[in-house]
Amino acid sequence: MIRFDKPIGTYLLLAPALWGLIIASEGLPTPFLVFTFIVGAFVMRSAGCTTNDLTDRKLDGFVERTRNRPLVTGEVSVIEALCLLFGLLGLALWLVMQINWLTVQLSFIGAALTIVYPFMKRFTHLPQVVLGMAFSWSIPMAFAAVTATMPAGLWWLFLANLL
């Protein structure tokens, strides 16, 4: 469910975070923030995959690409998957609490986007917009982590990443 063997999702989540950190810090983010965002990207990508697997578990058995996922095969129970999800979200919260209050506040929006995305596949033909917002949300978080503010210019980077 964490998908250690498919790191591209973590890289795609991490890239905007690093752009935000580098731009907000004018080229030299602290090693602490870089490390925290690297770990955070992995943890939140894993939480997103777990949420997606939980949400789609009744459909995944009908799709060739997803029919062998642990929830579909019974290798992992729903309770175990929920424990994993809450553990990942708890770890993400602990990580972000090491930064500053504005970043913590923004992280709740990021978590909400992560949790809502799989459900959007049922209600809209453009769930990728929500996924793009989730993947781009690390940009405002990075600016908040570096500057403890939300400068207006960060939204141009957010929009460029979203599109």
Q: Which sequence ranges carry the predicted segments?
A:
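Membrane interfacial helix-start motif at the N-side
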Residues: M1-G9, T73-E75, K121
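The first (N-terminal) embedded transmembrane alpha-helix
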Residues: R3-I23
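Short, hydrophobic transmembrane alpha-helix segments
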Residues: G20-F32
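Loop-to-transmembrane-helix transition segments
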Residues: P31-I38, G74
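Aspartate-rich (DDxxD/NDxxD/DxxxD) Mg2+/diphosphate-binding motifs
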Residues: G40-A92
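Intramembrane alpha-helical segments
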Residues: R69-W156
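Faces of alpha-helical transmembrane segments in polytopic inner-membrane proteins
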Residues: W156-L163
